[in-house]
Amino acid sequence: MGIMDLFKKKSSGNVAKDRLKLVLVSDRANCSSEMMEMMKRDIIEVISRYMDIDAEALDVKITETESDSNNGMVPALVANIPIRDMKHRPDPR
């Protein structure tokens, strides 16, 4: 895969396939959409104590990753959190 492959637009079929994979992995991890939203709110609350983030652009999902211990695929929580700025003094809560 070359660097230019990163900028190619995915076909709607590939996008749908990726979404279905995420749904299946989330289902296997027994994680409902309500649970994902609760985790997202908690992550925003904790991270916001230390940095200014773009909460609207925050993306949290469950994917699969290779396990080091049993050579199989395991669920992994992945968070993409756009940081605007670091806070010089963390908010005490």
Curated annotation (Swiss-Prot):
Prevents the cell division inhibition by proteins MinC and MinD at internal division sites while permitting inhibition at polar sites. This ensures cell division at the proper site by restricting the formation of a division septum at the midpoint of the long axis of the cell. InterPro entries: MinE (IPR005527), MinE_sf (IPR036707). The gene is minE. Coiled coil: none annotated. HAMAP family: MinE. It comes from the Bacteria. Keywords: Cell cycle, Cell division. Belongs to the MinE family. This is Cell division topological specificity factor. It comes from Agathobacter rectalis (strain ATCC 33656 / DSM 3377 / JCM 17463 / KCTC 5835 / VPI 0990) (Eubacterium rectale). One of its GO terms (biological process) is cell division.
